[in-house]
């Protein structure tokens, strides 16, 4: 969820302050508008936030805009900003080590290591999202952004955490990942949040980042998808938030070079207008469908199976004359012999060779 409190202890260096910073491969000119253009809401809970579109190193416009926003929303305002920016010495922030999977680790331990890494990066309270996430971008491009997150080691928000979680869990086929989005209502405003749902060995859990510990990672202990969603809903109630909508996407493929975008909202539930029994029914049906899709893709699109049924993959051959047209020419005495001869020209998959 987006927040308005400022955390000024983990701020990036401005352009030119650190020569080793990498330039983003998808950098674009900065817009002067407050809207960042990211797929994540630019105004969440009535609070505007900005998106860094200049890549790294951060340009002067984005840098100054961030500090102006912090000065407006922080309780000590400009005094605090001036104390930091005019300080003669600032401690160098530590760069956490990216977790590495070891064969001795269990899946829950590996997921916990990933979540601990995200927590070390910290949640971004500056009001400026450092990494632009365009939801319709191909998965390969989003994985490049995730690599950039590990290089820059800056605080992240919920949407960035989902992309980073996908990147760090790649190569573990037993772990299925899918996005879960929430739209909630509190004190006259709507809020948006997203986490990365996890399914492994018949259990559900999640990875993510939030200002609230109960609204990010969940242990891999939930037997059903509905149990996981209801646990999030109960956590929201602790903060007097009413969950209005829940959106669930499809499993994200374990192919970092895929040009396929992430499916963010395959299932949309207006949970505020539904009974829990109906919500559970819809969620469990959807969960079964997702699990079946894991088992079916290889067979559902297999050319071998389609051909074994005598069906052609070619549209032209599928339009061949039906047997009924042969019946119209039964007057010709040579037709039956010709038909037998034609059968010898069929290959093993039922295609007729025409000369």
From Swiss-Prot:
Chief localisation class: cytoplasm
Region (Disordered): 1-45, 297-337
Mutagenesis / variant outcome for changing residue 211 to A/H: Reduced tyrosine carboxypeptidase activity
Induction of synthesis: By VEGF.
Catalytic reaction list: C-terminal L-alpha-aminoacyl-L-glutamyl-L-glutamyl-L-tyrosyl-[tubulin] + H2O = C-terminal L-alpha-aminoacyl-L-glutamyl-L-glutamyl-[tubulin] + L-tyrosine
Biased composition (Basic residues): 11-26, 308-319
Phenotype upon changing residue 135 to A: Reduced tyrosine carboxypeptidase activity
Enzyme Commission number, as recorded: 3.4.17.17
A GO BP entry: regulation of angiogenesis
Alphabetically ordered keywords of this record: Carboxypeptidase, Cytoplasm, Cytoskeleton, Hydrolase, Phosphoprotein, Protease, Secreted
Top-level taxonomic group: Eukaryota
Gene Ontology molecular function: actin binding; metallocarboxypeptidase activity; microtubule binding; tubulin-tyrosine carboxypeptidase
Outcome following mutation: residue 192 to A: No effect on tyrosine carboxypeptidase activity
Subcellular location: Cytoplasm; Secreted; Cytoplasm, Cytoskeleton
Catalytic residues (UniProt): 158, 193, 210
Thylakoid found in the keyword field: no
Modified residues (Phosphoserine): 302
Pfam annotation, one family: Vasohibin
Gene Ontology annotations for the cellular component aspect, listed alphabetically: cytoplasm; cytoskeleton; cytosol; extracellular region
Annotated phenotype, changing residue 158 to A: Abolished tyrosine carboxypeptidase activity. No effect on binding to microtubule
InterPro entries, sorted: VASH1
Subunit structure of this chain's protein: Interacts with SVBP; interaction enhances VASH2 tyrosine carboxypeptidase activity.
Function summary: Tyrosine carboxypeptidase that removes the C-terminal tyrosine residue of alpha-tubulin, thereby regulating microtubule dynamics and function. Critical for spindle function and accurate chromosome segregation during mitosis since microtubule detyronisation regulates mitotic spindle length and postioning. Acts as an activator of angiogenesis: expressed in infiltrating mononuclear cells in the sprouting front to promote angiogenesis. Plays a role in axon formation.
Family membership: Belongs to the transglutaminase-like superfamily. Vasohibin family.
The protein, known as: Tubulinyl-Tyr carboxypeptidase 2
Species of origin: Homo sapiens
């Amino acid at each position: 969820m987006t927040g308005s409190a400022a955390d000024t202890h983990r701020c990036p260096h401005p352009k030119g302050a650190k020569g080793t910073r990498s330039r983003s491969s998808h950098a674009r000119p900065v817009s002067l508008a407050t809207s960042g253009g990211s797929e994540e809401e630019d105004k969440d809970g009535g609070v505007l936030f900005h998106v860094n579109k200049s890549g790294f190193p951060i340009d002067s416009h984005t840098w100054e805009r961030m500090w102006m926003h912090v000065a407006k929303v922080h309780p000590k305002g400009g005094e605090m900003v001036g104390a930091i920016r005019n300080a003669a010495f600032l401690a160098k922030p530590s760069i956490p080590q990216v977790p590495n999977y070891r064969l001795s680790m269990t899946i829950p331990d590996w997921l916990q290591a990933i979540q601990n890494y995200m927590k070390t990066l910290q949640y971004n309270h500056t009001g400026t999202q450092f990494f632009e996430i365009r939801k319709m971008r191909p998965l390969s491009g989003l994985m490049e952004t995730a690599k950039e997150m590990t290089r820059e080691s800056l605080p992240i928000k919920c949407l960035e955490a989902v992309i980073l979680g996908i990147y760090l869990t790649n190569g573990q086929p037993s772990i299925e990942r899918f996005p879960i989005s929430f739209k909630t209502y509190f004190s006259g405003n709507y809020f948006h949040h997203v986490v990365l749902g996890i399914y492994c060995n018949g259990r559900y859990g999640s990875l993510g980042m939030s200002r609230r510990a109960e609204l990010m990672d969940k242990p891999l202990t939930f037997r059903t998808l509905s149990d996981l969603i209801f646990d999030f809903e109960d956590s929201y109630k602790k903060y007097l938030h009413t969950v209005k909508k829940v959106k669930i996407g499809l499993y994200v493929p374990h192919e970092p070079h895929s040009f396929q975008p992430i499916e963010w909202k395959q299932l949309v539930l207006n949970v505020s207008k539904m009974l829990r029994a109906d919500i559970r029914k819809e969620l469990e049906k959807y969960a079964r469908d997702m699990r079946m899709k894991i088992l079916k893709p290889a067979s559902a699109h297999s050319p071998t199976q389609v051909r074994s049924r005598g069906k052609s993959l070619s549209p032209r051959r599928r339009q061949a004359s039906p047997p009924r047209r042969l019946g119209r020419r039964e007057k010709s005495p040579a037709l039956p012999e010709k038909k037998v001869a034609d059968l010898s020209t069929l290959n093993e998959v039922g295609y007729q060779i025409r000369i």
